[in-house]
Amino acid sequence: TCDFGDLILHVVKILEKNNDISDIYSQNFKYILVDEYQDTNFIQSKWLNLLAEKNNNICCVGDDDQSIYSWRGAEIKNFLEFDKNYENTKIVRLEKNYRSTQNILSVASELISKNENRVGKTLFTDGEEGEYVYLDSYRTGKDEAIGVSDKIEKLKTKFKLNNISILVRAIFQTREFEERFLKIGMPYRIIGGTKFYERAEIKDC
């Protein structure tokens, strides 16, 4: 049996051993576009090199600061050394941000600047400077839920609850917040998921 990685590996072997086949495919793809290039591994990069060999028209989009999949084989080196592997590379930096305030961008830039192995960029916006960014830390998820709910209680004197949001990395992280909100009677809704106690596996318990 073959998994997805094996399929690409066997394709690369075929292209490397058979010049005629390699020529057909590299000539067939006049332009190659790749997204999330920072997440490619060694064999995927090799495959792209073979496909782009004749026309050398390849456009790769990615963000070195979002390279989080090294644990599954992603090679940030593919991204960092792209201009060395392809002649006449033109690098276009997408640094203008349309979503966040400048204060958020400045904090994010300061944190990520500590990363090693990055091209580097300066994020900016034409929008407002925005509110200051505050950082609170908690010992447990329960403590965090209490702290956040206390802040919401203060904020709701100035803002409507539907203008206040909590962003989480994964849906399982909502549980502590939901339990806290249910306890104090604070209304809430989950966007992009299902409330913890309404999930089928929880109802079945």
For the regions a language model picked out, list residue spans one by one:
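Well-ordered alpha-helical segments embedded in enzymatic catalytic cores
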Residues: H10, W47, N78, E144-K154, ...
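Short, acidic/turn-prone active-site loops that include or flank metal/cofactor-
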Residues: D64-D65, G192-F196
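Conserved helicase NTPase motor core
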Residues: T1-E81, K96-S100
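Short runs of predominantly hydrophobic/aromatic residues within well-ordered alpha helices
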Residues: F4, I8, Q44, A145, ...
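Short, glycine/charged-enriched secondary-structure capping and boundary segments
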Residues: K46-N49, G73-K77, V107-A108, E179-K183, ...
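Helicase P-loop NTPase motor core
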Residues: E87-K90, E95-Y188
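Conserved short internal alpha-helix adjacent to the catalytic or cofactor-binding core
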Residues: E131, L182-M186, T194-C205
